[in-house]
Amino acid sequence: MRYLTALFVLVASPALAAGDDAPKGLFNPSLGNTDFVVLLGFLLFLAILFYFGVPKMLGGMLDARAEGIRSELDEARALREEAQTLLASYERKAREVEEQSARIVTEARANAETAAEQAKADIERSITRRLAAAEDQIASAEAKASRAVRDTAASVAVAAAAEVIAGGTSATDQNKMIDEAIEEVGRQLH
């Protein structure tokens, strides 16, 4: 600061010595010349700015701001890459879920077909069992009816035999009647 004051006094002394009748202009050093005074004030202002390191501070601030912007850009790039990674991961998971749902649908259809075939086979077995049971019942009813016919035929034969015996028929007539009764029973059974 001492040097600046000495420089200012040195530059201003010829202007003070010249007085008011000195020529005007920027290159005419006179304190009465406003252009010269403004130039000196501006130079003094610049000197003060440089003395206190304002350009370095401004440069540092601008560099810090540029570094901040650069770090924000790097962070934005990193976030973008992370977002792309997450997007790819979600797309992959979506494909996996879609494939899994397709597999589940395929398995469900296969299980439904298997269950339908199993139900059909169970129904066929049930029908076969019921038919067999019905046939057994029919055979049992036929056997029962056959026994009833035999019993009736035997009763008729016994009654006929009783009449023959009671009527006093001959032995040949009795044999003939017995043979006829046996043939009648045979016809009724078949």
From Swiss-Prot:
InterPro entries: ATP_synth_b/b'su_bac/chlpt (IPR002146), ATP_synthase_B_chain (IPR050059). The chain crosses the membrane at residues 35-55. It is a single-pass membrane protein. Disulfide bonds: none annotated. GO terms for molecular function: proton-transporting ATP synthase activity, rotational mechanism; proton-transporting ATPase activity, rotational mechanism. Keywords: ATP synthesis, Cell inner membrane, Cell membrane, CF(0), Hydrogen ion transport, Ion transport, Membrane, Transmembrane, Transmembrane helix, Transport. It comes from the Bacteria. It holds the Pfam family ATP-synt_B. GO terms for cellular component: plasma membrane; proton-transporting ATP synthase complex. It is found in: Cell inner membrane. Belongs to the ATPase B chain family. F-type ATPases have 2 components, F(1) - the catalytic core - and F(0) - the membrane proton channel. F(1) has five subunits: alpha(3), beta(3), gamma(1), delta(1), epsilon(1). F(0) has three main subunits: a(1), b(2) and c(10-14). The alpha and beta chains form an alternating ring which encloses part of the gamma chain. F(1) is attached to F(0) by a central stalk formed by the gamma and epsilon chains, while a peripheral stalk is formed by the delta and b chains. F(1)F(0) ATP synthase produces ATP from ADP in the presence of a proton or sodium gradient. F-type ATPases consist of two structural domains, F(1) containing the extramembraneous catalytic core and F(0) containing the membrane proton channel, linked together by a central stalk and a peripheral stalk. During catalysis, ATP synthesis in the catalytic domain of F(1) is coupled via a rotary mechanism of the central stalk subunits to proton translocation. Component of the F(0) channel, it forms part of the peripheral stalk, linking F(1) to F(0). This is ATP synthase subunit b 1. It comes from Jannaschia sp. (strain CCS1). The gene is atpF1.
